From Swiss-Prot:
Enzyme Commission code(s) on record: 3.2.2.-
MF (Gene Ontology): alkylbase DNA N-glycosylase activity; DNA binding
Keywords (A to Z) from UniProt: DNA damage, DNA repair, Hydrolase
Domain of life: Bacteria
CDD domains: AAG
UniProt organism field: Pseudomonas savastanoi pv. phaseolicola (strain 1448A / Race 6) (Pseudomonas syringae pv. phaseolicola (strain 1448A / Race 6))
Cysteine pairings via disulfide bonds: none
EC primary class: hydrolase
Family statement: Belongs to the DNA glycosylase MPG family.
The protein, known as: Putative 3-methyladenine DNA glycosylase
Lineage: Bacteria, Pseudomonadati, Pseudomonadota, Gammaproteobacteria, Pseudomonadales
Amino acid sequence: MPAALPDHFFHRDAQLLARDLLGKVIRHKVGELWLAARIIETEAYYCAEKGSHASLGYTEKRKALFLDGGHIYMYYARGGDSLNFSAEGPGNAVLIKSAFPWTDATSDENALAQMQLNNPDASGAIRPPQRLCAGQTLLCKALGLKVPEWDARRFDPQRLLVEDIGQAPERIIQTTRLGIPAGRDEHLMYRFVDAGYARFCTRNPLRRGQVEGRDYLFLDQGN
């Protein structure tokens, strides 16, 4: 049985949580299989800034954002499911932006094959592993995570958990979040990417034309 992170792990500042989640593995049990993906990209959100759902105010749909750290907040984005975890402070949370399939003794090649069946490409063909979880809705589809089943719930160590498998990134890239409309605090550098997996995330912050110090920063572990 995988070892779940305790709820208090999530009860910390959203940016710290976003950084500390990089390298952790999400596991979701479907049937007899533990589907798994290593987190490689996260975004932090605060109630006090305009890019967050919580800034629009409390509703029953958004209640998970206002609960203690470690509650699951899911919503639909562009027709797909998205996964967030509440952080310390009402309305603060971390969006799991992308991940990379993870295989080990608990989550084997059969689990990976099931993830590929869950998330074929537009033509129905099998996606290569490196593209399987390269976006917030792709991740949820591959792992079989659905809004009606998990929104506003706690983790269930028997079915859904986040595990520390000792794979902390050597360097972290800090940059701006994706998809934030103009005038909604789009300038805030609240997106964090495992530098070793940058080419597999939603949008590579190291792509041509991006300038260090202007468009992104490197954070060494311990900073």
